[in-house]
Amino acid sequence: MRNSFLVRAFAAALLALGLAGTSVAQQAVRVGSTPTGVPFTFLDTKTNQISGIMVDLMKAIGKDQGFAIEITPMTFSTLIAALQASKVDVIAAAMYITPTRQEVVDFSDPIITYGEGLFVAAKDTKDYTSMADLKGEIVGVQIGTAYVKPLTDSGLFKEIKVYDTIPDIIRDVNLGRIKGGFADYPIVAYQLLQGGYPETRLAKNYKPVLPGSVGIGVKKGDKATLDKINAALRKMKADGSTDKILAQWGLK
């Protein structure tokens, strides 16, 4: 009887450990993303879900590494603070890898590299090719982006206004409150090409001077999560999965 009891107790302990392991394995990775960074991350009004390049990448990474993801939408400027406060485990957005950010965030291998785009009112027919063409003007940029400091440090502009979202900048360009706006080229190009802002145009001949690479961010020191993300990304780059996702969103 005693042996039978010990066998049952041992089996129960193993079952409990197995269930605990399953719970940990199935625990979702919380991903902070923005609802206004199309095509990288945006709110799909048809599904009421956050979609885009970074979401597709995180889903593929999770599938490869055996974890589910849970998207938490928030404004771009609050992403790092949310990560540091452990409100999210990962940042998946159009976030440049910069030395300043690397002081508080550990980034994955670079995913895509691009520069800033300039947009102005459609009725403004001037051929803008550089920042100097806007010398003495009021311009707009999204708060929290890597463009704020270099634009300020350039000393070219009368004033630099910061906004929560790119649509907010576009609105003020259309209203004549600012002369032009700077934003991630793929994001603003995608939004304008969708035809939702007929009063705004891209400065097609503008040459970007602030290139950067986008990566996935994790909390400083979270090597376990970072290693999983990088392992999956390297597989995906090797087998063409990353390029396929980028191509689906018009970036290849």
Question: Which stretches of residues belong to each language-model region?
Answer:
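Short helix-initiation/N-cap motifs at beta->coil->alpha
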Residues: 55, 70-81, 126, 161-175, ...
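Alpha-to-beta junction loops
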Residues: 66-68, 85-93, 137-138, 174-187, ...
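Extended ligand-binding regions for polar small-molecule ligands
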Residues: 55-65, 137-138, 143-145, 213-252
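Extracytoplasmic small-molecule ligand-binding "clamshell" domains
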Residues: 26-95, 103
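Flexible hinge/capping segments at coil-to-helix
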Residues: 121-138
